[in-house]
């Protein structure tokens, strides 16, 4: 579900945290991908005709494999290094949300049958999308596919987005690709949206910078988490009458949900029962994840062409020529991708000490006077500092 209205709130109140970029600008980047969310999207969109999903001759659904194979191939061709992270066991806090989803899916199935009886094609497509359910088999098939493609797979203890955020915070990956904005709430420094969008949609890739978002919103980390909980998340109900704008106002005024509740008029803003905002805050701040140091080394290997043909063509009835062509493009671009980005060959230097800033102004005057006296005859100067890539001798 993500965080209700967070994208718009950031666009209106922290526009500097959003940057549009091009797909190819992520060349050489390691990107953690929320696998479960994207598999669901593939099931909803890829190859759909009315209420019919893409299937093979045996009637087995293949929409998830079609989407996963060709979108992943596109990233690999562009030199992007994806690592797919799959959901583990849902946290206890999410049980109510999952129960609601099951109920909504049942309602959608009932509405779908009525739409079929009425011959309402628009309603048929609408409710069939709402009734989609990703099974363990779909996930396992995608894991098999990715391993055949030479792409690493990570299985999260609980939420994939929390695991992705851990990997991004530690520097194991550049950022995480998802459409759910609660990745920022989990602490991901950089969230990438629309990376998996089909080219036909012509949607620009967006990067969200968490540090800039907090700075422009003028919120601390804890306040940002409380803001997201108030706006609506998977782990806690919402307070009727408090939307995104009012949530931001209240967090800025009271500093926290706890402080807000002490002064809230329950007649005007009824608080649901239960309202596990403290537990939700703790889960966002300290989710159950595998520490990056304990994740096996991420390796991107050459695709197993014959293994992919066996799986996709012989078992799932994919077009063999399309599969082989995609594998050929991946192999052709693998050497280029392995060269990496230019900045990966440079080591960042520590920032210079700032203790001199506290020295008396008299010392500054003496230094300036000395520079003025000897500057004209000194050799080197600014020109001597110019390196191979320009001023400073390095290129970021």
UniProtKB/Swiss-Prot annotation:
Provide the binding site for Mg(2+) 2.
Answer: 180, 182, 234
Q: Which GO terms describe its biological process?
A: base-excision repair; DNA replication, removal of RNA primer
Q: Describe its PTM?
A: Phosphorylated. Phosphorylation upon DNA damage induces relocalization to the nuclear plasma.
Compartmental location: Nucleus, Nucleolus; Nucleus, Nucleoplasm; Mitochondrion
**Which parts of the sequence are annotated with region: N-domain?**
1-105
Molecular function per GO: 5'-3' exonuclease activity; 5'-flap endonuclease activity; DNA binding; magnesium ion binding
SMART domains attached here?
HhH2, XPGI, XPGN
The entry's cellular-component GO terms read: mitochondrion; nucleolus; nucleoplasm
Entry cofactors: Mg(2+)
Name the Enzyme Commission number(s) assigned to this protein: 3.1.-.-
Enumerate the residue ranges of region (Interaction with PCNA): 338-346
Give me the residues that bind Mg(2+) 1, please: 34, 87, 159, 161
Q: Where is this region: I-domain?
A: 123-254
Q: Which cysteines does the record link by disulfide bonds? A: none
- Domain of life according to the entry: Eukaryota
Q: What does this protein do?
A: Structure-specific nuclease with 5'-flap endonuclease and 5'-3' exonuclease activities involved in DNA replication and repair. During DNA replication, cleaves the 5'-overhanging flap structure that is generated by displacement synthesis when DNA polymerase encounters the 5'-end of a downstream Okazaki fragment. It enters the flap from the 5'-end and then tracks to cleave the flap base, leaving a nick for ligation. Also involved in the long patch base excision repair (LP-BER) pathway, by cleaving within the apurinic/apyrimidinic (AP) site-terminated flap.
Q: Which family does it belong to?
A: Belongs to the XPG/RAD2 endonuclease family. FEN1 subfamily.
Name used for this protein in its record:
Flap endonuclease 1
